[in-house]
């Protein structure tokens, strides 16, 4: 057994970073034990090694460090997480330490939080439907097991409520397999942390969840570790315990801000908007940990949530996230101001794998056809409403007025389901058919006649007028 060497050669401390001189045999990502002059112990991780100098990032901050009296010991291994199936139903801090007052966990093993690279050949194709209970996602932007589908939010929008709703309601249909939610909250306030903990406890969703909470006043370095710790937990539950795991990570913008803070402390050359040039690579090490493996029963599905600075979808964080992931769910300021909850803007939203998780045997045979028809009708109705604003309602044809009526009801009944309504996919499909019945059958050109005969409700012959709601 090798003896760990202790160093007292700390030469500099800058923000969350510490420089240790005259080191030997130190490796990148190695875990570091730090003992202060008063006996307090802290943890760190090697960020960079140049010659006999090691740059260490501190997990608990640098306050109170005395350069001459601080002892540093390199452990010889990277940061590891003690994992156990008993983690389900528990609440942890951003570094994986229990904070719920529950019993001490007995680790089944220790896993590197950076995970293992997945051979692309070993990946299985995502093709099983996950029901979130939200019509705008399940019906129009279907989430598939093993997919990574981000939510693009904006300042002041209720993405926390949406995240909690998905955590409560998500399930895999037609399966007896265990389902779990791993929830990673990064850089949130005390109020937001209380909301998530209370919501999951009161609804009973905590019984199938693992919650990691990194607060806004916690060190930035911890914020960088939190999603990796959450994903390590998810991979353990999925690939070693055979569970289907949904990982919800919010807010990825706070994570990227922590990366920028550490990069600035390292005096690295900044990239776009001051973020490090390796932001894309760094995000991919998180997002690419979603998926299914051939021969493994479990799966890891991701819903990362981010706040777009100034609602700018071209900002580096949503821009790079969109390149790596398989679609996006976009929340709308306009829908939110009009009182619609959740304010999901379905037209620019997209799930690139939605066709793989829908259809007979997975949802229902009319899923794809009604999805396409709803998209087309809603887009045409929005155009008709814009035309009415410019030219007046008198300029609209009778068909245009029907499209406007459809659009109003679509937003009020379909999108605006609230944060505590859990709709099955059958209920979403049936509601879609009910709304499509507002339009003449001749306008439903994206649905085959035999499907119209089977599912389309009979028109209400007593309706002689269509009233167009004024915005």
From Swiss-Prot:
GO biological process terms held by the UniProt record: proton motive force-driven plasma membrane ATP synthesis
What are the UniProt keywords, alphabetically? Answer: ATP synthesis, Hydrogen ion transport, Ion transport, Transport
Protein name (database record): V-type ATP synthase beta chain
* Cited function: Produces ATP from ADP in the presence of a proton gradient across the membrane. The V-type beta chain is a regulatory subunit.
A Pfam family annotated for this UniProt entry: ATP-synt_ab
Which organism does this sequence originate in?
A: Streptococcus pyogenes serotype M49 (strain NZ131)
The entry sums up its family as follows: Belongs to the ATPase alpha/beta chains family.
Q: Which Gene Ontology molecular-function terms are recorded?
A: ATP binding; proton-transporting ATP synthase activity, rotational mechanism
What NCBIfam families does the annotation carry? PRK04196.1
Gene3D superfamilies with a match to the protein in the record: 3.40.50.12240
User: Which InterPro entries does the UniProt record give?
Assistant: ATP-synt_VA_C, ATPase_a/bsu_AS, ATPase_F1/V1/A1_a/bsu_N, ATPase_F1/V1/A1_a/bsu_nucl-bd, P-loop_NTPase, V-ATPase_su_B/beta
């Amino acid at each position: 057994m090798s003896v760990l060497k202790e160093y007292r050669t700390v030469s500099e401390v800058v923000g969350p970073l510490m420089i240790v001189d005259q080191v030997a045999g130190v490796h990148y990502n190695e875990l570091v034990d730090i003992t202060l002059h008063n006996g307090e112990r802290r943890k760190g991780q090697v960020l960079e090694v140049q010659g006999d100098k090691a740059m260490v990032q501190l997990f608990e901050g640098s306050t109170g460090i005395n350069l001459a009296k601080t002892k540093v010991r390199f452990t010889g291994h990277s940061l590891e997480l003690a994992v156990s199936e008993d983690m389900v139903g528990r609440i942890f801090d951003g570094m994986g330490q229990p904070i719920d007052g529950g019993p001490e966990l007995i680790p089944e093993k220790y896993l590197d939080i950076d995970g293992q690279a997945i051979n692309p050949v070993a990946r299985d194709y995502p093709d099983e439907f996950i029901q979130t209970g939200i019509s705008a996602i399940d019906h129009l932007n279907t989430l598939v097991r093993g997919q990574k589908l981000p939510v693009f939010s904006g300042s002041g929008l209720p993405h926390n409520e949406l995240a909690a709703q998905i955590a409560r309601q998500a399930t895999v249909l037609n399966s007896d397999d265990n389902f779990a939610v791993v929830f990673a909250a990064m850089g949130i306030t005390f109020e937001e942390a209380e909301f998530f903990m209370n919501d999951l406890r009161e609804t009973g969703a905590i019984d199938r969840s693992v919650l990691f909470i990194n607060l806004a006043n916690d060190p930035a370095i911890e914020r960088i570790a939190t999603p990796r710790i959450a994903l390590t937990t998810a991979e353990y539950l999925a690939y070693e315990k055979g569970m289907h795991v949904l990982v919800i990570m919010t807010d990825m913008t706070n994570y990227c801000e922590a990366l920028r803070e550490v990069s600035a402390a390292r005096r690295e050359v900044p990239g776009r908007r001051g973020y490090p040039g390796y932001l894309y690579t760094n995000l991919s090490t998180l997002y690419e940990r979603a998926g299914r493996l051939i021969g493994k029963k479990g799966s890891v599905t991701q819903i990362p949530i981010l706040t777009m600075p100034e609602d700018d979808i071209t900002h580096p964080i949503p821009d790079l996230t969109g390149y790596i992931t398989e679609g996006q769910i976009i929340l709308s300021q306009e829908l939110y101001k009009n009182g619609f909850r959740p304010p999901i803007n379905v037209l620019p939203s997209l799930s690139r794998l939605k066709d793989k998780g829908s259809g007979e045997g997975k949802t229902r045979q009319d899923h794809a056809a009604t999805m396409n028809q709803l998209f087309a009708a809603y887009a045409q109705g929005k155009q008709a409403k814009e035309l009415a604003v410019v030219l007046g309602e008198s300029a609209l044809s009778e068909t245009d007025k029907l499209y406007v009526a459809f659009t109003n009801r679509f937003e009020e009944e379909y999108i605006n389901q609230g944060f505590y309504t859990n709709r099955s996919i059958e209920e979403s499909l049936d509601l879609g058919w009910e709304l499509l019945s507002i339009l003449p059958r001749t306008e439903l050109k994206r649905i085959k006649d035999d499907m119209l005969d089977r599912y389309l409700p009979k028109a209400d012959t007593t309706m002689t007028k269509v009233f167009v709601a004024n915005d």
